[in-house]
C-alpha cells in the first residue's frame, strides 16, 4: 500500500533547488551587471531611464540606475542592495561593486556546474578578500594631516577622480575645489545634512557658487512683502511652527448669534488673537521671522510697518538647517519667545539669482554650514550634477576621516590580482583554483575601463600584467592616450576605504548568492473584494477579508 503523500506547501508554490537554480541566480546577477557595465569610468556612457509616471532621469551613477530599475528577481535584488549600501557608506564605487560581485559569480560558475560544494567557494572567497584588504592597507599611501596644503591637494585630487566619470567631468577642477571648500567649512563631525544643494535654472555651470551659510529660495509671499527690508546686520531670528493668518472656519462649524454685536465680537476676537501673536513676536526683538506654516497678508503688512522680514511655508529641512546653524529652537507657540530660543547670524540678505530670489544667512555662530547653489540648463542635467556632487562630497568626507589613498584607473585591482595569483600558487588543492578565479575576476575593472573607452582591452591588460610583474604597482589604464600610465603620478587617486568597502561588499554578496540552495516563491493569494453597498450603510454586510496563506518550507 502506497503511503499518503504529505502536502506541505500550498498549491501553486514555485520551488526550485539544486545546481540549476544556483546557476539561474548567477545568470540573473549577470543581467544586472550588464545594465550598468557601460557606465564605468571617465569614458562611460549615460543611461536615460523613464519611470512609470513618465519622469526622465539621465545618470551614470550605478546606485541611481539600479534604484530606478524595478528589479523583481530575488537574487538580483542583492546586487541592487550592495550598490545602495556602497552609495550610503562611501558615496562612490557603486558601479565597481556591482561589476565585481557579478564577475566573482561568473568566474565560479563552472565550478558550481561541476558540483563543487558552495562552502568551499565561500571559504576561498573570504580568505582572498581578507588578503586583498590587508594588501590595500599595506600599500596605501598615507597623507599627513598636519600639512594643510598637502591635505587640501589630496582632497581635491580625490574629488576630481570621483567627478571624472560624471556628466560634469569638463568642469571637475572647478567643482572639486568647491566640494573641498564646502566640506572644509563644516565642523569635525562633517555632517552631510549641513551642506545644502539648491538648483537654479539658467546660467552656465561655472556660475554655480558656494555660500558660507544657509540659503533657500524665497517662499510665496503676500502683498506688503515689497515694503520689508531685505538686509539686516546681526538680526535675531524667530523660528516658528505657527500659523499667522486669518482662516475660514473648519467644515461644519456653526456659531449661533442673536445680534449683529455678537457677530462683531466674534470677528474682533479673531483679529485680537492674531494681533496678540504678532505683538509678542515684535516685542521679542526678532527682526527675521521664519515659519513652517503660512504667514498671511495681515501679518506680512504688520511686519513691514515695523521693519521686520517674514517668510512663511519655509520647507522643514531648510528651517532645521537654519536652527542648527543660527541657534535657537523652533517654537510651536509665541508665548515664550525669549532670547534663548531666538537664532542669530552676522548678516541676513535677500539676493536675486537667475530668475529666483534667495534668502541668505551668513556668519552663523552655532554650527558651521554651507550651501552650494547650482546653475545650469535642463532639469535632468542639474539633477545629475547634484548626484555627482553628492558622490564627490562623500569621497572627500571619507578621505578626511581615513587619510590613506590608492591609485585608481584599475591600478589597485591589477596589483591585487597579481598578489592573489602569486599567493594561489603557494597553496594546494581546490583553494588554489578558486583564489585564482577571484584574482582573475578583479581584472574586470581595468578591462571594462578599456572597453568603455573603445581600446583594445586584451593588449592593455597584457601590458599591465607585465608592468605589475616588474613592480610597477600603481600602473593602470590611461584613458587619454590609449596606453598604461603610473596613475599615482597622474593624480588619479581614491580613498583606500572606497576600494576596501567595494571588495568586502562584492565578496559578501557573491558568498550570499552562492550559499542559497533553494528558492521558494509563495503564490499570490487572491482576496475576494467585498460586495458593493447600496447607499450609506444600507448595503449587505461586507465579508471579512481572508488572511493571506503562508507556505512553510
Curated annotation (Swiss-Prot):
Tell me if Metal-binding is a UniProt keyword of this record.
Answer: yes
Q: Give Gene Ontology CC terms.
A: chaperonin-containing T-complex
Q: Where is this region: Disordered?
A: 523-553
Protein species of origin: Gallus gallus
Residues the record lists as binding ATP: 41, 93, 96, 398, 409, 499
Q: What does the protein in this record do?
A: Component of the chaperonin-containing T-complex (TRiC), a molecular chaperone complex that assists the folding of actin, tubulin and other proteins upon ATP hydrolysis.
Q: Under what name is this protein listed?
A: T-complex protein 1 subunit eta
Tell me which NCBIfam families the record gives: chap_CCT_eta, thermosome_alpha, thermosome_beta
Family matches, as InterPro entries = Chap_CCT_eta (IPR012720), Chaperone_TCP-1 (IPR017998), Chaperonin_TCP-1_CS (IPR002194), Cpn60/GroEL/TCP-1 (IPR002423), GroEL-like_apical_dom_sf (IPR027409), GROEL-like_equatorial_sf (IPR027413), TCP-1-like_intermed_sf (IPR027410), TCP-1_chaperonin (IPR053374)
Amino acid at each position: 500500500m502506497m503511503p499518503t503523500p504529505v502536502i506541505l506547501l500550498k498549491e501553486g508554490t514555485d520551488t526550485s533547488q539544486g545546481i540549476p537554480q544556483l546557476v539561474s541566480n548567477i545568470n540573473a546577477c549577470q543581467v544586472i551587471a550588464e545594465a550598468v557595465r557601460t557606465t564605468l569610468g571617465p569614458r562611460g556612457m549615460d543611461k536615460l531611464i523613464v519611470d512609470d509616471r513618465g519622469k526622465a532621469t539621465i545618470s551614470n551613477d550605478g546606485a541611481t540606475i539600479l534604484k530606478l530599475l524595478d528589479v523583481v528577481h530575488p537574487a538580483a535584488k542583492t546586487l541592487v542592495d550592495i550598490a545602495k549600501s556602497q552609495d550610503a557608506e562611501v558615496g562612490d564605487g557603486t558601479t565597481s561593486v556591482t561589476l565585481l560581485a557579478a564577475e566573482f559569480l561568473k568566474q565560479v560558475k563552472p565550478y558550481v556546474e561541476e558540483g563543487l560544494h558552495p562552502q568551499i567557494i565561500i571559504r576561498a572567497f573570504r580568505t582572498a578578500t581578507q588578503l586583498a584588504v590587508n594588501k590595500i592597507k599595506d600599500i596605501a599611501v598615507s597623507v599627513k594631516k598636519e600639512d594643510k596644503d598637502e591635505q587640501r591637494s589630496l582632497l581635491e585630487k580625490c574629488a576630481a577622480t570621483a567627478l571624472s566619470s560624471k556628466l560634469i567631468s569638463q568642469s571637475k577642477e572647478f567643482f572639486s575645489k568647491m566640494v573641498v571648500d564646502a566640506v572644509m567649512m563644516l565642523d569635525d563631525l562633517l555632517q552631510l545634512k549641513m551642506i545644502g544643494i539648491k538648483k537654479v535654472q539658467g546660467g552656465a555651470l561655472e556660475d554655480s557658487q558656494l555660500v558660507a551659510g544657509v540659503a533657500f529660495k524665497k517662499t510665496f509671499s503676500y502683498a506688503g512683502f515689497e515694503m520689508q527690508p531685505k538686509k539686516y546686520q546681526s538680526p535675531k531670528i524667530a523660528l516658528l511652527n505657527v500659523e499667522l493668518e486669518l482662516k475660514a472656519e473648519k467644515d461644519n462649524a456653526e456659531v449661533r448669534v442673536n445680534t449683529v454685536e455678537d457677530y462683531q465680537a466674534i470677528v474682533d476676537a479673531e483679529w485680537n488673537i492674531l494681533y496678540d501673536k504678532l505683538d509678542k513676536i515684535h516685542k521679542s526683538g526678532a527682526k527675521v521671522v521664519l515659519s513652517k506654516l503660512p504667514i498671511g497678508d495681515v501679518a506680512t503688512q504688520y511686519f513691514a510697518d515695523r521693519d521686520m522680514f517674514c517668510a512663511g511655508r519655509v520647507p522643514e529641512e531648510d528651517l532645521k538647517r537654519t536652527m542648527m546653524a543660527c541657534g535657537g529652537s523652533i517654537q510651536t507657540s509665541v508665548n515664550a519667545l525669549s532670547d534663548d530660543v531666538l537664532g542669530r547670524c552676522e548678516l541676513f540678505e535677500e539676493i536675486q539669482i537667475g530668475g529666483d530670489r534667495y534668502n541668505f544667512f551668513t556668519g552663523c555662530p552655532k554650527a558651521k554650514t554651507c550651501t552650494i547653489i547650482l546653475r545650469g540648463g535642463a532639469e535632468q542635467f542639474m539633477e545629475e550634477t547634484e548626484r555627482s556632487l553628492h558622490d564627490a562630497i562623500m569621497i572627500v568626507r571619507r578621505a578626511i576621516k581615513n587619510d590613506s589613498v590608492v591609485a585608481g584607473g584599475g591600478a589597485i585591482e591589477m596589483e591585487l590580482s597579481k598578489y592573489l595569483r602569486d599567493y594561489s600558487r603557494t597553496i594546494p588543492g581546490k583553494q588554489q583554483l578558486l583564489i585564482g578565479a577571484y584574482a582573475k575576476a578583479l581584472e574586470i575593472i581595468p578591462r571594462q575601463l578599456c572597453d568603455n573607452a573603445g581600446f583594445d582591452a586584451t593588449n592593455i591588460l597584457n601590458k599591465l600584467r607585465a608592468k605589475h610583474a616588474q613592480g610597477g604597482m600603481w600602473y593602470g589604464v590611461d584613458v587619454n592616450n590609449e596606453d598604461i600610465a603610473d596613475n599615482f603620478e597622474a593624480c588619479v587617486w581614491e580613498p583606500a576605504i572606497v576600494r576596501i568597502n567595494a571588495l568586502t561588499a562584492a565578496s559578501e554578496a557573491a558568498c550570499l548568492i552562492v550559499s542559497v540552495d533553494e528558492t521558494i516563491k509563495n503564490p499570490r493569494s487572491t482576496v475576494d473584494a467585498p460586495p458593493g453597498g447600496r447607499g450609506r450603510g444600507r448595503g449587505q454586510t461586507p465579508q471579512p477579508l481572508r488572511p493571506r496563506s503562508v507556505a512553510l518550507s
